[in-house]
Amino acid sequence: VFAGKVTPKDSIILMIAFGLGLAIPALILFLLAFFRYKIEGHDDVAKLTKLPIIADVAIASDRAKTKADIVVHENQNNVMEEVFRSIRSNIQFMLKEDQKVIMFTSTTSGEGKTFTAANLAVSFALLGKKVLVMGLDIRKPRLTNLFELKDKNIGITNLLVHDNPTREDICANILNSGVNRNLDIMPAGPIPPNPAELVSRESLDNIFATLRKEYDYIFIDCPPIDIVA
């Protein structure tokens, strides 16, 4: 009878160690990917939504606050202007002739939707198109500050409280942007206690029907979807 010490073969130990060395990192990566809930880039959006991606805006203001955040200017060729020119061209190619209204939203506040809407609107205005930016982010409006508009009491909330605002009422709540004569702004206006109820009113459809006759494009700065939800 052999009573000596029995040990596994070195080759078996190496194989087990090699297998664990591959399996454990792979398991960790799988779990990280499985439980990841954040959209982190272009590829994630393309994979999850199956929607066409018009462009990537790589650099944006955290919160569009003043005219310094307007990066598109006439007779200038900076990097951001090229980005918005590319977006403009893609949108023009995609839209049909009667499609005039474009909505801008984001997953949460501070992602740059107002920045994008404002600068794209300037880009279209520089083409000679008559453009309106409408502020429907009523809880946290930024258009008035972004374009440094003087009258804080003008805006769409003044219209939504009426069932059928007239053309004169609508025009009275529109201001020129001060950036380009082809670009007008309809700010959010005074913040009401019930913004969700206001934007659900039928009067909003009547406002759009009037504005479609006046403008080539209407850009809507909407609230983030987490606030809507």
Positions of PLM-derived features:
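Loop/turn-to-beta-strand initiation segments
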Residues: G128-K130, R181-D184, R212-I220
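Conserved beta-strand segments of the P-loop GTPase G domain that flank and frequently precede/overlap
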Residues: M103-T105, P187-A188, I218-D221
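Short boundary/hinge segments that flank catalytic cores
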Residues: K9, I13-L132, L136-I156, V161-C171, ...
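Structured cytosolic domains appended to multi-pass membrane proteins
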Residues: I138, I154, I185-P187, D221
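Conserved D-loop-proximal element of ABC-family nucleotide-binding domains
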Residues: N194, V228-A229
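Polar/charged helix-initiation
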Residues: V1-K5
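Short acidic/glycine-enriched loop/turn segments that link adjacent beta-strands
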Residues: V179-N182, V228
